């Protein structure tokens, strides 16, 4: 370092890169020495095929410091104009209770956890999600709810699919009320097209005139009207038609529940229960239904079971009915949820309680009645006189003038043909109502004076629509209304869950890397969080700038030509990408191309997504090294050449290796007229070294919650934007807001408010930083592989003996020799303070390990030592020192009660059970329950909150 360029070197802004990447230079060299290579470059040369290596570095802006990045992003955010939005249409301003904002939404203990597939270390969020299900079933008066879906429009499309599967009416027509939200109709039309359903849109009163397998009604309607649906539903049932109702949760605090009117399915959004609008998301949608449809409901369902000691414990129930597991037989590809947002909504209900929520609903309705009365006094005509929180004004030729006056007063109304819509919400005040009167009528009124003219409460809700039944009577919704008690309840749940705040989560194919604090901060900025997704475009310049900038970044990283940011999950990205392929073929007069080739090792969402666009799935074999069998591929191509639509393939492969023949595979598909869908789940092993576009793929989705640092949230949110080559750009998802078709999500930018996280990651890392992250992810995985290979068989390796960013250890031989299963090893790792790797995917009886670039050598070594110790424990079972029925593996995990209880009937010590690799003085994460009985939970299905006696005290 010379004095001539000292300042430039001190200002290099590379600090964040070293903070994101786990191993420092010294640790990297130690790992390289273990691998017997001289440098990272040499290791990459031995791992990544030369013919797919990028010829030049990515052309991204130089890395910014955290301070610079936040300043840049603040400048972008400031371009958004945050008006008072009364647009409604399923999106409402809300007050996020500060105790939830700080202790859940902004808390890495909640947002860095993974989906609770390991329930013994997930009891906290499982309880919160069970509360969510109880909240939904109570408010809707249904019997069963799932633990959230991606958005309300997606939930409506899923409801249509459920109706088709469960209905005894053989029609192929689905009825949609003309008063549903337009974005919901968009997504239904897309889904229906590829299921070959006909969609009829008409007033709900005309449902009896149609022979349909199912119907969707909105309650209240998108224009605000409230009317009793009981007779309409009864008439539909007489024709064996199933009826789904899209309902508003806050409205259900004062309106008669859809379940009380006979609904078969109820869907909607929990957004207004304390989750910011965020320009469209992320939000937790919901679906509730009848008990008899429990095997048909999509998404995750939390259930009550027991552990090995017979104590109540929670788990995800009926996992074998999840659609991604059903593969090509699926009607849905749902494999994620919106857990973080569902938890926030459930905590909102816990904090406010039934009385607080009902008071809120009463207040919103009263303000709406006062607003309507003042407008009528000024001569404004209402389209409907029965409403909850939304009124529609018949303004005719005055529509534009009134709309513009409102805009001039920084008020957003909903613009309809010759009409204006106004939706009030929790945040609306009396002053807001008076401002609306002034803008709309140019007259001043006083709220108190107008209220005096009203009759009894609920004067604008028909008597047969007023709720009389109780809800949220479980003690959990009636106990935590002081901030002190709520804070302790939240903390008690958080303390039960393992997250990245505790240690490595080495889940293969999940990329549980650092979610840096600086990247998370902008999510709660009001310039991002309070934007309505259907606000006028000139108010949304900040989001448009962010989306364009982020898309440009992804284009450079992937080698594609265009991006859509609309899909709300990786599976939804797959669906959108396959639709783009099918629309492309149709545009060329080749809509007969409907064969999708999929390797036998593929994730279950691949065949599920292909099934959803009516593709016929043909499986391609893999060889003993885990690669696509080229001979079998060529045979399948020749057999289906004229009908070949696409091939779906993951790269690096699902088996964790860089297939040498990937370019040849792409060429073979293209020669036969097909398109290549490259699943971006493993993009963390590509960035900066290769790219889907360079390899030869046509379309990919990217999991922003994997490679690009959006946190997993304990089971969502996620995002799955899709990139395409130029010939597919015209077939990306559209939206009615832009007068285009093909929507897969409710809003054009999907879960827009979490885009700043991934934008910030790329801005902080720059091209070299992103490349180094990829290299270190590969280094960490190969180091684990090298250290474990003397103890466990490594199932798949590349041509030169290397793995990509993950490795698979094969436990099948050990199960044969000892009886110890992969589940036993996974549960035993909890006793060492680790989350288990991915179990039995992509091969049954294995564990797939992905350390990511963010873990240090110290953490890797502790994990390796744990697995080596476990191997020695297995040897004791093999040798007969421990019996198969009584050893620390089959009895794992062990709890604090095991350590301190009076009874210990085991052949091994408590110290061996609870502190297998550390002394008792060291910190340890404790599972809060013993191993959970999955079979019992499915045979005795309970998906609502158990009696309060089953809960331990959360105040002690």
From Swiss-Prot:
Q: What is this protein called?
A: Glycine dehydrogenase (decarboxylating) 2
Naming one, the record's GO cellular component terms include: cytosol
Q: Which family does it belong to?
A: Belongs to the GcvP family.
Q: Which GO terms describe its molecular function?
A: glycine binding; glycine dehydrogenase (decarboxylating) activity; pyridoxal phosphate binding
Q: Where in the sequence is the signal peptide annotated?
A: none
Q: Organism's domain of life?
A: Bacteria
Q: Which keywords fit this entry according to its UniProt record? A: Oxidoreductase, Pyridoxal phosphate
User: Which Pfam families does the record match to this protein?
Assistant: GcvP2_C (PF21478), GDC-P (PF02347)
Subunit text: The glycine cleavage system is composed of four proteins: P, T, L and H.
Please name the source species. Colwellia psychrerythraea (strain 34H / ATCC BAA-681)
Residues bearing the modification N6-(pyridoxal phosphate)lysine: 706
Instruction: Name the top EC class.
Output: oxidoreductase
